[in-house]
């Protein structure tokens, strides 16, 4: 998993971040019948018409650039600071395509037809992977895309992270590319061979690692100055000089269209204008594009907006071709449709959860939350369908574990679509009572039977311990507060006292995370926190989040079975290992998993193309080369 921990305002509750996260209007959730499981899946909002037949016309397509998402980086070797879906998917990948393309409509899976290479071939006990580049891809200056361009990217990645690991966003120290690669060979112009230091899971390496490789034009970029000679980039000192030159050029936003570096592309579009102040830009088709579908739209124009309100006003006025529907405007969908737009929403492939702190000793919470029945009881108090109806305006999908119920992926286990702990206050009370707690629905439950035997509270929980603890949550967007307020209310109905405490996202991740950033004091007196969530890669292992030593394991969850399953997902050869990992974590509840909100895309009814090319907008992918006007 290439995990991107995010403020909910950026990724977790809205996929696109600021684009959707204006808080929806308040209101209590509409409850399902207590104790009645439901396997009905939500997710889709609106519909996509079939591709129009008949004459196909050209014209300028304008699309809405959400607030705060203006491109700040152009080099396809992306720094951590610029490692965002908007910067990469909507901007860079229109010009430079990754080795393997992922995103097939709403499904987070590989799209072979849009990949620069054929499927990789594994050998040597899953320690060697051979890749054959497709012959159709050429750079815009007519030169072919070769194995040397892949090697160039790899050597520049090594040079970048040698200076600072933050210079490449996908980098995980000791893991994957480049640290686990012993050698890269280019036996032919179309063949690249990666030899690894240890056997890996092929699915993980393809989805998480090879998908981040973006061939770069060595014949045009392997230099250290504008007029300097081409250098041997395989020499580390030269690679460093080249990286410093390219990264400096990437920081010069006002030269994006004048610098000849950025005109050498292999994607469907080239950059024709860029406003460094506003982030507005235009693109035109690359006539040398060797992909499966040449662009029909002659001009793609990104129109920046300073607020969701301004963007929605443009949609309502019909002045933008492709945009989005902010969550707080979901109820105005009929107005949007009457303004001449198609509307379709779907959840992104990510997971949100409330973190449990397994190390918080306040009130013996560490011992309380270590009991599986406690985590199961809390899960029974969350009304996912009610949240989707009341807080998401119906635009959302269930998620009961680290792999959401929707969208489905090749790695979605069968049990991901069924809630193992359906909303039921009665079931929560039953679990607590059967484990030695005295229930007080007008106050706070207490442990009546201390001990580790059947019907007792569990190890380290003294008699008389109250079932009371705090929950720290992010103030933005307001939808988080609505969810945790409802949870606290339902918990009170079962005699569980949850003290809510709000804070801003940056404060939470600075002072309440574990491990804490260097030089910051760590506040460990929190039982639960809701800061947002994680964006899944297409290979959805939770490595780094729920394994014991994970760098993003804020709650110190450490389960030997989970550790073994997560490890097998990455280094084992079992293609279904990640399914077993997800199934166990869904049952074991290392955190309280929450439903996912839809990203709702809108586009003019006279703009058409394959349904998948519009569905993929909900996953923050952009494939305008497939579009055309019908009128």
Features from the language model and the residues they span:
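Surface-exposed binding/hinge segments that line
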Residues: 56, 170-246
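Extracytoplasmic/peripheral linker and loop segments enriched in polar/acidic and small residues
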Residues: 48-54, 376, 388, 497-520, ...
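Append "and occasionally in soluble cytosolic enzymes with long acidic Gly/Pro-rich linkers
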Residues: 282-287, 369-489
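N-terminal lobe/hinge region of extracytoplasmic solute-binding protein
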Residues: 61-124, 264
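Ligand-site clamp/hinge motif
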Residues: 257-260, 280-333, 497
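Gly/Pro-rich hinge or "lid" segments in bacterial periplasmic/extracellular proteins
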Residues: 105, 213-294, 430
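Aromatic- and charge-enriched surface segment that lines or borders ligand/interaction sites
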Residues: 118-165, 187, 193-195, 311-314, ...
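Long beta-strand-rich cores associated with HINT superfamily self-processing modules
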Residues: 37-39, 603-631
């Amino acid at each position: 998993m290439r995990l991107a921990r995010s403020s909910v305002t950026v990724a977790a509750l809205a996929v696109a971040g600021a684009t959707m996260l204006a808080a929806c209007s308040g209101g209590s959730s509409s409850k399902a019948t207590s104790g009645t499981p439901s396997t009905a899946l939500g997710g889709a909002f609106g519909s996509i018409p079939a591709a129009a037949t008949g004459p196909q016309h050209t014209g300028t397509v304008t699309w809405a650039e959400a607030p705060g998402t203006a491109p700040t980086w152009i080099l396809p070797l992306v720094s951590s600071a610029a490692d965002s879906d908007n910067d990469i998917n909507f901007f860079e990948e229109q010009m430079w395509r990754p080795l393997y393309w992922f995103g097939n409509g709403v499904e987070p899976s590989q799209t072979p037809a849009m990949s620069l290479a054929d499927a990789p071939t594994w050998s040597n006990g899953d320690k060697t992977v051979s890749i054959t580049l497709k012959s159709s891809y050429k750079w815009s200056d007519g030169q072919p895309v070769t194995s040397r361009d892949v090697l160039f990217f790899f050597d520049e990645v090594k040079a970048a992270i040698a200076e600072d690991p933050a210079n490449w966003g996908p980098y995980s120290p000791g893991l994957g590319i480049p640290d686990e690669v012993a050698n890269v060979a280019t036996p032919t112009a179309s063949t690249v061979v990666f030899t690894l230091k240890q056997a890996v899971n092929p699915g993980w390496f393809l989805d998480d690692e090879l998908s981040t490789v973006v061939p770069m034009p060595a014949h045009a970029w392997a230099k250290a100055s504008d007029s300097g000679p081409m250098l041997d980039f395989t020499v580390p000192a030269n690679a460093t000089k080249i990286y410093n030159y390219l990264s400096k050029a990437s920081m010069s936003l006002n030269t994006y269209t004048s610098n000849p570096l950025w005109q050498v592309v292999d994607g469907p579009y080239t950059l024709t204008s860029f406003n460094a102040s506003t982030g507005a830009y235009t693109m035109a088709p690359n006539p040398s594009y060797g992909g499966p579908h040449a662009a029909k739209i002659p001009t793609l124009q990104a129109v920046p907006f300073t607020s969701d309100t301004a963007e929605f006003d443009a949609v309502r006025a019909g002045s933008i071709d492709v945009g989005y529907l902010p969550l707080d405007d979901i109820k105005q969908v009929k107005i949007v449709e009457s303004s001449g737009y198609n509307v379709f929403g779907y959840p992104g492939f990510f997971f949100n959860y409330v973190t449990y702190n397994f190390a918080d000793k306040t009130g013996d919470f560490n011992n309380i939350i270590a009991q599986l029945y406690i985590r199961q009881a809390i899960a029974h108090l969350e009304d996912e369908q009610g949240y989707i109806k009341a807080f998401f305006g119906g635009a959302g999908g269930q998620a009961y574990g680290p792999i959401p119920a929707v969208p489905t992926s090749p790695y979605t286990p069968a049990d991901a679509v069924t809630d193992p702990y359906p909303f039921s206050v009665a079931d929560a009370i039953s679990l607590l009572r059967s484990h030695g707690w005295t229930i007080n629905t007008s106050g706070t439950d207490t442990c009546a039977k201390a001990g580790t035997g059947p019907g007792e509270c569990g190890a380290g929980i003294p008699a008389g311990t109250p079932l009371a603890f705090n929950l720290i949550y992010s103030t933005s967007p307001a939808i988080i507060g609505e969810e945790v307020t409802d949870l606290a209310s339902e918990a009170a109905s079962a005699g569980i006292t949850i003290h809510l405490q709000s804070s801003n996202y940056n404060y939470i991740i600075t002072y309440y995370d574990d491990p804490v950033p260097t030089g910051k004091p760590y506040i460990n007196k929190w039982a639960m926190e809701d800061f947002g969530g994680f964006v899944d890669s297409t290979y959805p292992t939770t490595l780094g989040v729920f394994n014991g030593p994970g760098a993003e394991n804020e709650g110190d969850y450490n389960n030997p079975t989970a550790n073994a399953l997560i490890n097998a997902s990455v280094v084992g050869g079992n293609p279904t290992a990640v399914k077993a990992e997800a199934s166990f974590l869904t049952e074991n509840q290392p955190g309280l998993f929450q439903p996912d909100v839809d990203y709702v895309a809108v586009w003019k009814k006279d703009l058409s193309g394959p349904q998948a090319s519009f569905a993929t907008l909900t996953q923050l992918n952009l494939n305008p080369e497939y579009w055309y006007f019908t009128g």
